[in-house]
Amino acid sequence: EYSPGGKSHKHGHVNEAAFYILDGAGYEIHDGIRYDWKAGQVAIVPNNCVHQHFNASETKPARALVIKTKPMYMFMNMLFQHTVEKRPKTPSPTQGNFVPRQEEEDYNYPTDEKADA
């Protein structure tokens, strides 16, 4: 889900992803090319594509069901994901009470004792 006026961090990964848009309207930037989407459509992110997701509405959230092949890449030890531009630390235009996360779990490469369990 992307809040009104929200966006994801700019990133890339080796696995593809499919986004079935449940509600709202927005767009993606894939390697510098814009692709618009709305409810009922599917957005495809191809392998090795630097991309970012945007909610085009200033008043309504955008929601999507995301389908990825990431587990297969993890199983084959071929997962590579890289953040190109970090998540925004400022509120989206309509979300004045936004508080950024102070910490974020990295479930791909855990560093605590749970990883050894």
PLM features per residue range, with description:
Residues 1, 44, 66:
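Conserved beta-strand segments that form the floor/walls of ligand-binding pockets within enzyme
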Residues 1-12, 47:
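Conserved short histidine dyad/triad with adjacent acidic residue
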Residues 4, 14-26, 31:
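Glycine- and acidic-residue-biased ligand/ion/polar-headgroup-sensing regions
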Residues 18, 41, 51-53:
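Hydrophobic/aromatic beta-strand elements that line small-molecule binding cavities or substrate pockets
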Residues 32-48:
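Short acidic-glycine-tyrosine-enriched beta hairpin
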Residues 52-116:
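Double-stranded beta-helix
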